Amino acid sequence: MSTREIPLLLDGPCGPLEALYLDLPDARGLALLCHPNPVQGGTMLNKVVSTLQRTARDAGYSTLRFNYRGVGQSAGSHDMAGGEVDDAEAIVLWLRAQQPQLPLSVLGFSYGGFVAAALAGRLEAQGQVVE
């Protein structure tokens, strides 16, 4: 089993979003990982987010972590006003297109926990199931 993440630039509301994707064969689900506040140095490479990624991978989940707008190679400017939730929703659209049959889990650390919870609420309001 390959455990190497593939670097991607995915379409986001403000332009490309930098991401790392691991597509496991026979995955039991999809895990979207959201990072801490960029103002305080948070990126998708944060050590807690990296640990979440490995834990989800080891549990059999395909994983995707990404940088919000204005972080790393992602276009736009960080706004802490909902734009990061819009970014995460765009990533979910891409993830679901890859493996629509798999359940989705959304995880985050610190500010990423806020983004994950807000995203889960938004998706559930649209009738989507989030684990």
Predicted feature residues:
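Glycine-rich "HGGG/HGxG" loop immediately N-terminal to the catalytic nucleophile
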Residues: 69-80
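Gly/Ala-rich beta-loop-alpha elbow adjacent to hydrolase catalytic centers
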Residues: 108-116
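Active-site signature of alpha/beta-hydrolase-fold catalytic machinery across serine-
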Residues: 118-122
